[in-house]
Every structure is written in C-alpha cells, then in structure tokens.
C-alpha cells in the first residue's frame, strides 16, 4: 500500500473536513504518517489568503482576483507542504485543490477553463492528486447545513443558490469526465455511512485493506 495524495472536493456543506479527519484517523491506525491540510490554507501565506477570500467584509473581490490569490497560495502550499510530505512517504489529505478552482471560478463564475488550467499548471508545477473524493450534496441541503452554524458562515456561503448549483454541476461534470480519478459519495447520508463509503472507494482504487478499524 503506497501512501497517496488524496483531495476532498465538493459543494458547500458536504462534510469535507469531517470526512478528511475520519480518513486520517483510520489511516493512522494502520501505522501510516498522514498530513492533513486544506486550501486556501496550509501555510502562513495560505491562511492569510483564506482570511481575505472568505471574510465577510463588503469589499468585492473579482473572480479573476480570486483565481490569482488562490494560485499564489497554492504554489506556496505545494512546495512548502505537499511535496515534502510526499517525498518522505506520507499520505497527504487535502481539503480542496485545483478542481475547486475549476468548479467555483470556472463553473460558478464562468471563467475560461483553459486559462484556469494554465494558471494551475504553473502554480502546482504539474502536481496532480492520486485521487479525488467528491462529497456530493444537493445545494439546499448543503447550504442549510452551513447556515445552521452562523459563526462558521463565510463569504462563499452567502452567494446565490444558482451560483452554488453551477458549482455543484461543475464538480459532477469533472468527476464524470475522469471517473478513474474520482470517488463520488452521496454526502446526504450519516457521518459513519459516508466514512465507510469513502474508505470503500479508496480501497477500490488505492489498494487499501478492505477492512480496518474505524
């Protein structure tokens, strides 16, 4: 079993951070090193970009500006966190990566995918995840989950439902276009059931043990 670079993607309210933590804990029970990280974030620069992009002040940030800020944070994150972790044989579990840019700024805001891909290629140096886990949830359910905790609501959560539907559709299109590199999980189920489905999906593609302690 080779430690891999696995990214959790999906629309808002899918439970990415919860399921990432569950998977990390499960992998650690079999003795592997696991690095948990997120985008934007993972580095001092990334956390500063995260605060800027997700803050609730009334300053309008253009979609093109979002792309460039995210790319800058991603370039730092890849080289400072992800590549070194991979080099020492650790699992890297990341909450969002390049596909979120394609879904949010591409699908949601309508920016050209070809341009986005060129920027991401430069930012990542061509680094590609071994697998993506798409935690899919209908927009109405996902946003209701997010707004149930007012303290956690961010700028993206306040975008229109139509915007979030475009984002979800873009994620589903990305997964359908490359099914060997995606595990699509119905995230409307309970936390334990979703965790089991995530593990089964990874086991099918990354030769994980079929059964392990949860």
Segments from the language model and where they lie:
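Pre-Walker A (Motif I) flank of P-loop NTPase domains
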Residues: 2-5
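Hydrophobic anchor at the beta1->P-loop junction of P-loop NTPases
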Residues: 8
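Conserved lysine of the Walker
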Residues: 16
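NTP-dependent small-molecule kinase module
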Residues: 22-24, 140-214
């Amino acid at each position: 079993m080779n430690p891999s670079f696995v990214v959790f993607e999906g629309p808002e309210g899918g439970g990415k951070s919860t399921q990432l933590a569950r998977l990390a804990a499960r992998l650690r029970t079999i003795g592997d090193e696991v690095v948990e990280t997120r985008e934007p974030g993972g580095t001092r620069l990334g956390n500063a970009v995260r605060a800027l992009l997700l803050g609730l002040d009334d300053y309008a940030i253009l979609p093109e500006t979002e792309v460039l800020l995210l790319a800058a944070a991603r370039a730092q994150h890849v080289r400072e966190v992800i590549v070194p972790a991979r080099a020492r044989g650790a699992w890297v579990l990341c909450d969002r990566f390049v596909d979120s840019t394609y879904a949010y700024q591409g699908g949601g805001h309508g920016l050209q995918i070809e341009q986005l891909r060129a920027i991401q290629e430069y930012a990542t140096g061509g680094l590609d995840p071994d697998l993506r886990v798409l935690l899919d949830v209908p927009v109405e359910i996902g946003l209701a989950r997010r707004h149930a905790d007012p303290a956690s609501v961010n700028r993206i959560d306040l975008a229109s439902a139509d915007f979030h539907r475009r984002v979800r559709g873009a994620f589903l299109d990305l997964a359908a276009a490359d099914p060997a590199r995606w595990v699509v999980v119905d995230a409307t189920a309970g936390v334990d059931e979703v965790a089991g489905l995530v593990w089964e999906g990874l086991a099918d593609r990354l030769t994980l043990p079929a059964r392990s302690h949860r």
